[in-house]
Amino acid sequence: MRPQIMPFYIEMGKGDGGITGEDILQNWMLKSNLKNVEILEELPLRPTKLVVAISEEIYPDVYTIEDFKEKVGDREVFIASEFPEIARKYAEKHGLNAIVFDPIGKTEAALLPPMPEADLIIEITEFGTTLKENMCRIIDLVMDKVHSVFIVNKESLKDEEKKQVMENLVTDLKEVIESRNLVSFYFNVPNEDDLRRIIDYLTENGFDPTISPLAKGGAAVHIIVDRSRVKFLKPIIRGMGAKRIATSPVITSGTNRAAQQKPFYLLSGIQREFPSASPFF
């Protein structure tokens, strides 16, 4: 199930919950005024941005939407976007005489010379790398932070069993996502004085270390740390007397609490029970 169609399926009651993007949900809200869908939880994935971009080659002197409006005047302009309703609202807001279309293939390809299909595009991006590679320049921001969200059917939330399953599933999803940036950080400290200094340092910096005694004295220490902090933490701990420093990925236990309960119509991949002849699954 593609995230682009998820809000519609949840609205129609073909599923109880699923994952989509805030941009996709907003586009559907503008198009169909969804009444039965709500966001249960925002997922901790890195957000993206919804931007307006033009071809640097076609419009070399355009750096802002105001520059673009001055350049095109009242003439008809073409806007390519996978979010046509958002694009129409944007065009109306800025007084553009626009024809909006959903491109076939990559949105940025609609700007490629010598025969571009569009004057500007409204596209999702994370860092803007692909746009730069295609000689596209960002001239405006439509949505600053676009998050992935878990959406649910409002009627499904009235069923306490379904609600509990979905809440458990979202908790599991968040734990798995958040653990991707974490590592287990292990080391031994043979000297008791060094151990006390290291434990004091760790607790002062927000860590909650697990300490296990070693057979020949000292202790083995374990903490969970963000991957980005390891290269800074390692020399500090080593300088304080730590030995045999090692790291490993954090393995989420994966209790799968949702799957252990009665299945329900969820459009994002857990086991479910429904007639095999259903055209929607």
Curated annotation (Swiss-Prot):
Its top-level enzyme class, in one word, is transferase
Reaction(s) catalyzed by this protein? Answer: 1-(5-phospho-beta-D-ribosyl)-ATP + diphosphate = 5-phospho-alpha-D-ribose 1-diphosphate + ATP
Give a yes or no for keyword Metal-binding in this entry: yes
A GO biological-process term: L-histidine biosynthetic process
Q: Where in the cell is it found?
A: Cytoplasm
One Pfam family name is: HisG
Q: What does this protein do?
A: Catalyzes the condensation of ATP and 5-phosphoribose 1-diphosphate to form N'-(5'-phosphoribosyl)-ATP (PR-ATP). Has a crucial role in the pathway because the rate of histidine biosynthesis seems to be controlled primarily by regulation of HisG enzymatic activity.
Name of the protein this chain belongs to? ATP phosphoribosyltransferase
Q: Which organism is it from?
A: Archaeoglobus fulgidus (strain ATCC 49558 / DSM 4304 / JCM 9628 / NBRC 100126 / VC-16)
